[in-house]
């Protein structure tokens, strides 16, 4: 017989010990309402909208906000979902999956509140909160009619699209991006636009049926059941559905008595035995939150990776890969390299000759795109057998900051090219690259992608950028990595991890020093191009040190 789940309780109060069955639930409710109203009054009527004032203004009627920013604002601080450290090893593969936490419990038990408290206490920047509310099935016309009259059971396992939930969670655990539907509770349908979620170190999945599917259970590394008194859950549901989802009191109570309460007793309450931790009183139980956070921290420590150090010691004494193409070193190209490498070169000259090299590099890279035979007619009415681009579209993605300087050269030779950006910076404390921001065009998976960065030393930032593209389902053989200058170490690292990525540059230098600078190198390209002060101990490919 399986051991019963652990119950994490709050510190008992010496002055007011719990004496009644519903005391813990009331204590949690007091804690929650005190945060909202700064009042100790405990009245169910106070939590409901005034009867005579009509329906409350609708605040949010969908499962999630489409314009939700990539951050979590709390009473203490703002936690940005940025600065993600490497989620792969030196081979370019994910060595360990993300840590997935499942939060189950009855409707309005405080699962989302507990999830946000865990996120705040974790203080880990890359966390994804995935709500089961987004995965309600698309209703038929008959079911739509039933839902409009509060006669459809949304608290039954059949109401959820478990196939989509499982596939979404699997991709997130693999570090890939996913599309999540946005469910409209007023029309009981999915919105046309879906929200994009990106892979993270920690995934928190919450929902009333979080433990109702065996396959789903196997994906969860930690299972938490939020146990809240039924009266409190009813009050919270009334307040939420009336003020946020545009429902009326009679309809909410009818649905609760007919579907919600019976479904809780039949499907949700029995899953408590499957939980690793049971959290009584929900958000009021700080001891439980601390226990959960400590365990997650220990799991994350086991998943820490040091990619840059591994890259520096790997792939030594190997011949340059066949996927590398170096622009022919003509006297003109070598002359421009002489100018931009010279520390005495003025900023104006540095920019001018860098742009010339970029244009040549882009033109050279385009020759590796797929072309097919085509025939056109000349103005003289004669046929000409030529070539035309055989792909769907070309997209340029620049690794900020220095990679942005290559965008004008790409636009000059590729008409109507789409541009995306990725911000990767070095954490000055760990020396590891961190992903801070990305903006990619839609449907990028079918495009040939030109990834641009002006210098590549160890290849750590370039590998992270390639991983981002792969997580967006861009085929590896459709990615072209372009750089004005590379070190042999960076070339080997990228080619070994991603053997089908085409690497194109104007020159390859032999070595990298202890500060991960290319030798003889070009200096810090971003600082020389933009005229900013150099960052001590920074690398060529990471121009701005992380200060968070």
UniProtKB/Swiss-Prot annotation:
Keywords: ATP-binding, Cytoplasm, Host-virus interaction, Kinase, Nucleotide-binding, Nucleus, Phosphoprotein, Transferase, Ubl conjugation. Residues 1-78 are annotated as: Disordered. GO terms for cellular component: cytoplasm; cytosol; nucleus. Pfam families: PRK, UPRTase. The modification Phosphoserine is found at residues 16, 56, 63, 539. CDD domains: PRTases_typeI, UMPK. Ubiquitous. InterPro entries: P-loop_NTPase, PRibTrfase_dom, PRK/URK, PRTase-like, Uridine_kinase-like. The keyword Transferase applies. Gene3D superfamilies: 3.40.50.2020, P-loop containing nucleotide triphosphate hydrolases. One of its GO terms (biological process) is CTP salvage. Residues 1-22 have a biased composition (Low complexity). Pathway: Pyrimidine metabolism; CTP biosynthesis via salvage pathway; CTP from cytidine: step 1/3; Pyrimidine metabolism; UMP biosynthesis via salvage pathway; UMP from uridine: step 1/1. Ubiquitinated by RNF19B; which induces proteasomal degradation. It comes from the Eukaryota. ATP binds at residues 105-112. One of its GO terms (molecular function) is ATP binding. It is found in: Cytoplasm; Nucleus. Residues 23-45 have a biased composition (Basic and acidic residues). Belongs to the uridine kinase family. Interacts with RNF19B. (Microbial infection) Interacts with Epstein-Barr virus/EBV EBNA3. PANTHER family: URIDINE KINASE. May contribute to UTP accumulation needed for blast transformation and proliferation. This is Uridine-cytidine kinase-like 1. The lineage of its organism: Eukaryota, Metazoa, Chordata, Craniata, Vertebrata.
């Amino acid at each position: 017989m399986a051991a019963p789940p652990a119950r994490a309780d709050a510190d008992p109060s010496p002055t007011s010990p719990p004496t009644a069955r519903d005391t813990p639930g009331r204590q949690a409710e007091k804690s929650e309402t005190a945060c909202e109203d700064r009042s100790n009054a405990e009245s169910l009527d106070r939590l409901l909208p005034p009867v005579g004032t009509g329906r409350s203004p609708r605040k949010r009627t969908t499962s999630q906000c489409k314009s939700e920013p990539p951050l979590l604002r709390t009473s203490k601080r703002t936690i940005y979902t940025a600065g993600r450290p490497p989620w792969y090893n030196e081979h370019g593969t994910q060595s360990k999956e993300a840590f997935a936490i499942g939060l189950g419990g009855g409707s309005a038990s405080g699962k989302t509140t507990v999830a946000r408290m865990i996120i705040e206490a974790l203080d880990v920047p890359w966390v994804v909160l995935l709500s089961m509310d987004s995965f309600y099935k698309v209703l038929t016309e008959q079911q739509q009619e039933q839902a409009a009259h509060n006669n459809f059971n949304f608290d039954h396992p059949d109401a959820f699209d478990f196939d989509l939930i499982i596939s979404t969670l699997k991709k997130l655990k693999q570090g890939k991006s996913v599309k999540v539907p946005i469910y409209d509770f007023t029309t009981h349908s999915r919105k046309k636009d879906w929200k994009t979620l990106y892979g993270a170190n920690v995934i928190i999945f919450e929902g009333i049926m979080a433990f109702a599917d065996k396959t789903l259970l196997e994906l969860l590394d930690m299972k938490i059941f939020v146990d809240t008194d039924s009266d409190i859950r009813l009050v919270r549901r009334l307040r939420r559905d009336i003020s946020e989802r545009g429902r009326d009191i009679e309809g909410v109570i009818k649905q609760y008595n007919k579907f919600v309460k019976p479904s809780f007793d039949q499907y949700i309450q029995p899953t408590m035995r499957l939980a690793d931790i049971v959290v009584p009183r929900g958000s009021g139980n700080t001891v439980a939150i601390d226990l959960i956070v400590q365990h997650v921290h220990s799991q994350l420590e086991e998943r820490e990776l040091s990619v840059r150090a591994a890259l520096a010691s790997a792939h030594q004494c190997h011949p340059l890969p066949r996927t590398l193409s170096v622009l022919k070193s003509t006297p003109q190209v070598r002359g421009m390299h002489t100018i931009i490498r010279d520390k005495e070169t003025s900023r104006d000259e540095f920019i001018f000759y860098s742009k010339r090299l970029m244009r040549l590099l882009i033109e050279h890279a385009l020759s590796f795109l797929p072309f097919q035979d085509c025939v056109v007619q000349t103005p003289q009415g004669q046929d000409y057998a030529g070539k035309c681009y055989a792909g769907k579209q070309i997209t340029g993605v620049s690794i900020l900051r220095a990679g942005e300087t290559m965008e004008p050269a790409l636009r000059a030779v590729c008409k109507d090219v789409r541009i995306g950006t990725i911000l990767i910076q070095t954490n000055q404390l760990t020396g590891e690259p961190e992903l801070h921001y990305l903006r990619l065009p839609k449907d990028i998976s079918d495009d040939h992608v030109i990834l641009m960065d002006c210098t590549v030393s160890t290849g750590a930032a370039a590998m992270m950028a390639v991983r981002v593209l792969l997580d967006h389902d861009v085929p590896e053989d459709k990615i072209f990595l372009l750089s004005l200058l590379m070190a042999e170490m960076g070339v080997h690292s990228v080619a070994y991890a991603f053997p089908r990525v085409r690497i194109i540059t104007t020159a390859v230098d032999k070595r990298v020093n202890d500060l991960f600078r290319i030798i003889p190198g070009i200096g810090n390209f971003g600082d020389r191009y933009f005229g900013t002060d150099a960052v001590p101990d920074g690398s060529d490919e990471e121009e701005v040190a992380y200060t968070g």
